[in-house]
């Protein structure tokens, strides 16, 4: 009898837990767990996803993880990526669609040492510049093309050093400049002992070379599924709630990031500082893509006369369907 009762209890518990289990959503991040993705971790920690009936799995990225490949292979429902790489992938046959744009501004920069002769963009000619690849190189290549600087190492151009994920090429003198983000690597350079007066910083946002970063992308075919669209509406709504909470509570958001840093490599000082910088980039966005920002990004990517990132105006690369339903 006791065995029968136990079996009934187990069956009832299973039925109840199944009935109340949220719809599963997996998001693939562009990089490792850090404040760059605070909105998603905050939304999960504060129960915003639960309130929308979602069971969200957050997959950190890394140097050997290509979010678009994970998405294409069915390993995620939605991914965080920069628009240049997403549009380049779309032109090459992977139909990615932007469904939301939490980041309004670009944090990408080129940070240079003044003692290596770089004070203005005119000084870049003949210099070695550290550049990130894996899709991150597209804004840089477009910018160099607009400046009339070849990237093949010729005398009238620049030499591109394939940069890893550190800033050692700059600090050790291998490159005059390296790629940095306003919220991350720039501060690593500063922590290495360099003062603002010793550095020349070119912000893509002010150089007219900025492109949209950290948008949410899905596969186009999935948007034909009503249940998938419904999940994305709820996901975007909860995620933007997480982002606005993180903006208003940077220290708490940083603490949540540290709690989810399974690798244990992040520090409180760095994450609090990063969250403060990230908030400057998400400010002004409610999650809905601004068509003028999209048009600017496309213009930048197509502006390379000899080697444009994309060769034609994209069609169907973004939609307001999700954000209109989620935010209005």
How would you name each of these model-derived features?
Residues 23-163, 169-172, 176-183, 202-204, ...:
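Short, glycine-/small- and polar/acidic-enriched structural segments
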